[in-house]
């Protein structure tokens, strides 16, 4: 063995492993076998932490049940803390996020890294597994089929909380704009046609409420991840675990993670079923749908500036065209739209992978993980990007907004209780044909007085409509 390599052995024979690597031969083979995306497990630190938490919880349970020597358990726990508390070896998880084997490559990567950290703590060299073994000690009372999905669930839950934080900050940004724009009267639109007036503040407040609904939905679905199959081992029969291990390991995981994890109701079902991932990613898809709709609205409201709605101005961030001078595009809402499309596509991936399970195991969890972590990551970044580069800098074109209101035909709807729907149709048709305002036509036809129109079309009443029509007190009154 040279200074640059060490020799390790597995089922398939011996291999040379870089001497300074904390991973071992199993990880080396995975690197060679799966060169798919150039995205590594190290790029998802929450996943690394989730797996290490599982190993720490297992070591604590094994120590208490005396299934491994106390000194070995203590070293494993200390090695886990080196990663969890100090961030040691976070770059030692080079396995591609796309991997066959239901996650065995990541499970063994974790076992090897922790074993080699532990060996150094014991005063031994990396790879001297006769003292601390990745399989016999780090993987004690575990299988990839319970360790991997449990670590995955912990990781997705933690990542989900970061996304919720980002959504809340974006929501607060919309709230600030809602307050800023609360007195700006504008035209509401349905089917892209003039409807009735509202305030720009109300429009932005609706965006905020919409996002608040999504945080509640994400919270609700994320609780499904807290039911874990740790202790199930290979297929859910708890093979090679002592009595009491499964509930104890889950209890220790709750202590280590600070999360209220609970044992799955049926370990065989939990080991093969991926329904929770479908539900959680469905919530991500729903957020993407809503967020994309908001961005569509922002692009429409800022369209122009001369031949569009031009009700709001988005921050000018970069030149918009290589041929058209002075053109500036809504690039941030556009990129958020694209993020949302990708998340919606990922949802199809998760659905198909969850369906692809066979008998007692679903081997497609790695691609579910890739899709879920990507969706959460890009949605989190998109929320911050939209807030910082767009929402915070939006300004309103008050005069344009009010011009649309007072020159619209839609405000005739306010007159329905006074002149009736049929007269409203006639007024609207005349306005459309002649270009006259609703006020002009109503006065010409003698349907209402100037004073009555002033009251009905007051800014206050247009912003906050009050019922001003007749109320009937006698049943016989016509």
Curated annotation (Swiss-Prot):
Coiled coil: none annotated. It catalyses: L-aspartate = fumarate + NH4(+). The keyword Lyase applies. Its EC number is 4.3.1.1. Keywords: Lyase. Transmembrane segments: none annotated. The keyword Lipid metabolism does not apply. One of its GO terms (cellular component) is cytosol. Catalyzes the reversible conversion of L-aspartate to fumarate and ammonia. Homotetramer. This is Aspartate ammonia-lyase. The lineage of its organism: Bacteria, Pseudomonadati, Pseudomonadota, Gammaproteobacteria, Enterobacterales.
């Amino acid at each position: 063995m040279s200074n640059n390599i060490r020799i390790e052995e597995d089922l398939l024979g011996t291999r040379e492993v870089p001497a300074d690597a904390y991973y071992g031969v199993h990880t080396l083979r995975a690197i060679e076998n799966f060169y798919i995306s150039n995205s590594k497990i190290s790029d998802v630190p929450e996943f690394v932490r989730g797996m290490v938490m599982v190993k720490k919880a297992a070591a604590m349970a094994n120590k208490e049940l005396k299934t491994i020597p106390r000194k070995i358990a203590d070293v494993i726990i200390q090695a886990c803390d080196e990663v969890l508390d100090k961030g040691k070896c976070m770059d030692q998880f080079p396995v591609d996020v796309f991997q066959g084997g239901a996650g065995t490559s990541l499970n063994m990567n974790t076992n090897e890294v922790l074993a080699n950290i532990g060996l150094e703590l014991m005063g031994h060299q990396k790879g001297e597994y006769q003292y601390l073994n990745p399989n016999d000690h780090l993987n004690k009372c575990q299988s990839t089929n319970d360790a991997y999905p449990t670590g995955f669930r912990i990781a997705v839950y933690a990542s989900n909380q970061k996304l919720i934080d980002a959504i809340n900050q974006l929501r607060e940004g919309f709230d600030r704009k809602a307050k800023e724009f609360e007195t700006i009267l504008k035209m509401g639109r349905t089917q892209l046609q003039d409807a009735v007036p509202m305030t720009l503040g109300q429009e932005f407040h609706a965006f905020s409420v919409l996002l608040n609904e999504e945080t509640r939905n994400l919270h609700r679905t994320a609780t499904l991840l807290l039911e874990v199959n740790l202790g199930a081992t290979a297929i859910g029969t708890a093979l090679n675990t002592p009595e009491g291990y499964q509930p104890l390991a889950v209890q220790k995981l709750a202590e280590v993670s600070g999360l209220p994890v609970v044992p799955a109701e049926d370990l065989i079902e939990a080991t093969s079923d991926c329904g929770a991932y479908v539900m959680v990613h469905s919530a991500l898809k729903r957020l993407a749908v809503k967020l994309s709709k908001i961005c569509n609205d922002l692009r429409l409201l800022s369209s122009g500036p001369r031949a569009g709605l031009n009700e709001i101005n988005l921050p000018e961030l970069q030149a918009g065209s290589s041929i058209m001078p002075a053109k500036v595009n809504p690039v941030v809402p556009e990129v958020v739209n694209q993020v949302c499309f990708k998340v919606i596509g990922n949802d199809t991936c998760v659905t198909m992978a969850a369906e692809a399970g066979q008998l007692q195991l679903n081997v497609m969890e790695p691609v579910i993980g890739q899709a879920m972590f990507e969706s959460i990551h890009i949605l989190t970044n998109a929320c911050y990007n939209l807030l910082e580069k767009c929402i915070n800098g939006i300004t309103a074109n008050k005069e344009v907004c009010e011009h649309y209101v007072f020159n619209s035909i839609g405000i005739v709807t306010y007159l329905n209780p006074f002149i009736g729907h049929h007269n409203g149709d006639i007024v609207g048709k005349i306005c459309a044909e002649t270009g006259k305002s609703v006020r002009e036509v109503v006065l010409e036809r003698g349907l209402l007085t100037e004073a009555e129109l002033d009251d009905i079309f007051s800014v206050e009443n247009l912003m906050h409509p009050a019922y001003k029509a007749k109320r009937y007190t006698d049943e016989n009154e016509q």
